[in-house]
Amino acid sequence: RLVGSEMCIRDRDSTYDEYMFVCTDIHFATAGQNFEFQVNVDGQSGYNETVTTTIFEVHHKEDDSGTDGPSYLASNDQANGTAAIQLFGDSENDADASISGIVHLFGPASTTYVKHFYTRFTGMRDNARTGEVYTAGYFNVTGAIDEIKFRVSSGNFDGVIQMYGIA
């Protein structure tokens, strides 16, 4: 079980065509934060590779007083941006609150093509509502990706992040 403000995974092996990161029971120390990720190309630092993304969400309040979605989150997508990519936003930090989801990253070892990804996360959001967030895009780089960082926009988190290689 990981506890901290960020988790970095380094892999210099090109064994797999796809990597799947399974994030389970991610719990935030502070409410209202975003769970995010970014990558580094081999030999680079800063976790600020150029990325183009799209993101949408759905949610439903516990007391059935409101639903929303699917809603496109224009303020959270990027067009050749370098910021961290939002996986889940406005998290709750109640004792029973957490988020879980999966990140799929394709062809990270390629030195010819851009690197596509898609994600799906679900969990408890602020104001007692459940949410589901979908993000997709590509890293506009042709160098091999060898590092990925998961982090919270502010504060710490704990949870389990597992990496699987898919041939």
Model-identified regions with their sequence ranges:
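Surface-exposed molecular-recognition determinants
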Residues: S5-E6, R10-A167
